From Swiss-Prot:
Coiled coil: none
Record keywords, A-Z: Amino-acid biosynthesis, Aromatic amino acid biosynthesis, FAD, Flavoprotein, FMN, Lyase, NADP
Name used for this protein in its record: Chorismate synthase
CDD domains for the chain: Chorismate_synthase (cd07304)
Pfam (any one): Chorismate_synt
Top EC class of this enzyme: lyase
Native species: Leptothrix cholodnii (strain ATCC 51168 / LMG 8142 / SP-6)
Length: 385
């Protein structure tokens, strides 16, 4: 009831606060027998962790994961898996000036109105730090999905503020702090962020994420649709203000002759649907895009009120990301993995014995003309990054 648990069969309960002793999660429903150790989880946490470049918060947390339960002799037991990440670099004194005031754009006011009190240290429970346990849980889901179904997840930044990032090469994504699939634009992004940081301002971003190898049939009718759960998961990420699946809002300007993904014996002709029809996966890539708002914690003074309702001016101290989108790629991948994992287990439970006389369609029919090896969107998609 408290909004800290995600999933039905692969169930993740998130706990902790930004400046508490530790954060973590409990995973219930992971199948037994999978080889699992901290080394399987740590790489994704390292991709998300703060202090890795001058363009993100300088809070320097090692984010070393500890497996406290649910694993015996290197294999999952089928019992709850508790993952712990200790906080080591809190600076709570930085928040002394906002004990009685509300930071515009933050959850300070809404938490206070709901609970009658709030933890001002780093945002407490509303901090983006609470995404670290979800990344850890997502790494567990990714491993099972990769081993059982061959499903993989890839995310990248497609826009930083008003700067579009044209897709060029997926191999470039892990080689720069922006997760940009285009090495040529990285110097421009670096200069943009340097100027932004000096001005004391912040900016938003757009992140794309895909799941490849998802079998057809995942998802439920009506209220447990796969795409509905994806949108729910993505909106649970801090600072996300919009979600698109497939062509998304570009569908408004498309005609039916453009948008409908034709089926051929050789496979689907396009993927405007983003891999989901009627709430159920088609066997194509799941194509998701999220919009992330500018960071609310900025050095520039902003008008607000205090707890008595009197006007005041807030200047935010502390260490903050000038663009939270820079570290959002592994978070979006993790949340998508958690949704797919949950639905894979649900499909196995209810429809695992369903057999059909013909094999599933190919995710994409063979191309008839020269095209990039890894386009930003599948043939037929009319949305722009």
């Amino acid at each position: 009831m408290s909004g800290s648990t995600f999933g039905l069969l692969f169930c993740v309960t998130n706990f902790g606060e930004s400046h508490g002793p530790a954060i973590g999660c409990v995973i219930d429903g992971c199948p037994p027998g999978m080889a699992l150790g901290e080394a399987d989880i740590q790489p994704d946490l390292d991709r998300r962790r703060p202090g890795t470049s001058r363009h993100v918060t300088q809070r320097n947390e090692p984010d070393q994961v500890e497996i406290l339960s649910g694993v015996y002799e290197g294999r999952t037991t089928g019992t709850p898996i508790c993952l712990l990440i200790r906080n080591t670099d809190q600076r709570s004194k930085d928040y002394g000036n906002i004990l009685d005031t509300f930071r515009p754009g933050h959850a300070d006011y809404t938490y206070w109105r709901k609970y009658g009190l709030r933890d001002p240290r780093g945002g407490g429970r509303s901090s983006a730090r609470m995404t670290a346990p979800m990344v850890a849980a997502g790494a567990v889901a990714k491993k099972w999905l990769r081993e059982q179904h061959g499903i993989t997840f890839t995310g990248w930044m497609s826009a930083l503020g008003e700067l579009p990032i044209p897709f060029e090469d997926e191999s470039q994504i892990p080689l720069n702090p922006f997760y940009a699939p285009n090495a040529a634009v990285v110097p421009q992004l670096e200069a943009y962020m340097d100027a932004l940081r000096k001005s004391g301002d912040s900016v938003g971003a757009r992140i794309e994420v895909r799941a490849r190898g998802v079998p057809a049939g995942l998802g439920e009718p009506l209220y447990d649709k796969l795409d509905a759960d994806i949108a729910y998961a993505m909106m649970g990420i801090n600072a996300v203000k919009g979600v698109e699946i497939g062509a998304g809002f570009a569908s408004v300007a498309q005609r039916g002759t453009q948008h409908g993904d034709e089926l051929t014996p050789a496979g689907f002709a396009s993927n405007n649907a983003g891999g989901v029809l009627g709430g159920i996966s088609t066997g194509q890539d799941l194509v998701v895009s999220i919009a992330i708002k500018p960071t609310s914690s900025i050095r520039s003074p902003k008008a607000s009120i205090d707890r008595a309702g009197a006007p005041t001016v807030v200047e935010t101290l502390g260490r903050h990301d000038p663009c939270v989108g820079i570290r959002a790629t592994p978070i979006a991948e993790a949340m998508l993995a958690l949704v797919v994992m949950d639905h894979a287990l649900r499909q196995r439970a209810q429809c695992g014995d369903v057999q059909l006389p013909i094999p599933p369609l190919a995710a994409q029919a063979p191309r008839t003309e020269t095209a990039p090896a890894t386009p930003p969107l599948d043939a037929g998609d009319d949305i722009e990054a």
